A protein has these predicted regions:
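Short SAM/SAH-binding signature in class I
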Residues: 84-91
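Conserved Rossmann-like nucleotide-cofactor binding loop
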Residues: 51
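Conserved SAM-binding motif I beta-strand of class I
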Residues: 42-47
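Conserved alpha-helix/loop element of class I SAM-dependent methyltransferases that forms part
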Residues: 2-17
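S-adenosyl-L-methionine
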Residues: 54-82
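Conserved class I S-adenosyl-L-methionine
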Residues: 17-26
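Class I S-adenosyl-L-methionine
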Residues: 3-5, 77-78, 95-227
């Protein structure tokens, strides 16, 4: 099964020779490709439900690869730190991903794991969580798939809490010079501007209005809208 554009991007971010943990593996298409391509030397593939793991098991048997270990568990609860150096959490909401990271205390222990994260919703909340918990977002790439825009980000724990402007949580390190990056940032701009427009003229909502107005102005500058 050929990988989707989104999964291809995720696979490209995996370091060569990695020991990967793929959370919420579903059909195990990504782990199979990582082993076949030689990107990963071993993959632990987890899912919280038995049915997806059964589908994964069938696909792994068909593929002929043997370096994939399937585990039924919630997030990283059945994974030891010594077993992995790269963790993929994709296809879930930003708040769900934050919860999985938060419960795996060993992600904050040396040697640090590379996190490859692809939220389907609330990417701004995931970025906010990462920054608040001393993770550095090392890359942030926008990708369009089936008419939807996603961000795929990499992060690593540093132990250093940094200060970032509010708009960073909405656009991260996405490059506006790429086509998908431009449209991703444009979407966030329109969202912030729409909120500001809806709140304009409401005295009891002045604080929220000013927040979204400033947010849209900062994001707009990234797109050279000149606000």
């Amino acid at each position: 099964m050929p990988l989707s554009l989104r999964l291809k991007l995720i696979a490209s971010l995996v370091p060569d020779g990695a020991r990967v943990c793929d959370i919420g593996t579903d059909h195990a298409y990504l782990p199979i490709e990582l082993i076949k391509s030689g990107k990963a030397i071993r993959v632990i593939a987890t899912d919280i439900r038995e049915k997806p793991l059964e589908n994964a098991r069938k696909n792994i048997r068909k593929s002929g690869v043997t370096e994939i270990d399937l585990r039924l568990c919630d997030g990283l609860s059945a994974v030891e730190k010594s077993e992995t150096d790269s963790v993929i959490i994709a296809g879930m909401g930003g708040e769900v991903i934050s919860g999985i990271i938060s419960r795996a205390k060993w992600l904050k222990e040396k040697p640090y794991n590379l996190l490859i994260l692809q939220p389907t919703t609330s990417p701004e909340e995931l970025r906010r969580f990462l920054i608040a918990n001393c993770f550095e977002i090392t890359s942030d790439t926008a990708i369009s798939e089936n008419g939807k825009l996603y961000s795929v980000m990499t992060a690593v724990f540093t132990g250093n809490k940094i200060s970032v402007p509010e708009y960073f949580y909405y656009v991260g390190k996405v490059d506006p010079k790429t086509e998908d990056g431009f449209f991703y940032i444009q979407k966030q701009y329109r969202r912030a501007k729409s909120c500001a427009d809806a709140l304009f003229g409401l005295p009891e909502k002045k604080t929220e209005y000013l927040h979204f107005k400033e947010l849209s102005e900062h994001i707009g500058r990234l797109l050279n809208y000149g606000e």
